[in-house]
A protein has these predicted regions:
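Active-site anion-handling motifs in enzyme catalytic cores
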Residues: 1-161
Length: 161
């Protein structure tokens, strides 16, 4: 089923803008966060930046992102996250980043849900912007929790060795 995904960039994002997905009032009342960091930033400053980002994610009402490194912490913190799938151009460059991850996220898209389900070969957690109650965003799927528990156990066992 993943061989069809190289076409998703044109299917999901046919020259769209953020305003196509998110109401203007939500954008105006939001904080935009960039993750670009100077390559010369020292370790202590990086740790401080990471802590500040995690605090922002934890206290957010909703996070809308196209970045996995933002979405995954939001899932673990219980912060509602809507993942905008973009940048997927071909199997070799991008699919390895998405395999097994998108099953556990809510995807914000303009695409018809059934078409996306067909492209992915399974039911995905997809939302059209018109379906979202922006004051009460959808809760994250809980399917990732069983994997989180397995990882916690493995990490604890490793640390205790």
């Amino acid at each position: 089923p993943f061989k069809k995904l190289f076409k998703l960039m044109d299917v999901i994002f046919p020259k769209s803008k953020i305003e196509d997905f998110i109401p203007k009032d939500v954008i105006l009342n939001s904080e935009k966060i960039e993750h670009y960091i100077n390559g010369e930033t020292d370790h202590n400053a990086l740790m401080s930046l990471a802590k500040n980002l995690l605090n922002k994610y934890a206290s957010a009402k909703l996070v809308i992102t196209s970045r996995i490194h933002c979405a995954i912490p939001c899932l673990s913190l219980g912060t509602p996250v809507l993942f905008i799938l973009k940048g997927l151009r071909d199997e070799n460059q991008h699919m390895s980043r998405f395999r097994g991850i998108l099953d556990h996220m809510n995807i914000l898209t303009l695409q018809n849900k059934q078409e996306l389900n067909t492209l992915f070969g399974k039911k995905m957690n997809c939302y059209h912007p018109d379906e979202i109650d922006w004051e009460n965003p959808p809760k994250n799927p809980s399917t990732f929790k069983k994997y989180a528990e397995i990882l916690k156990k493995k990490c604890t066992m490793y640390i205790n060795q």
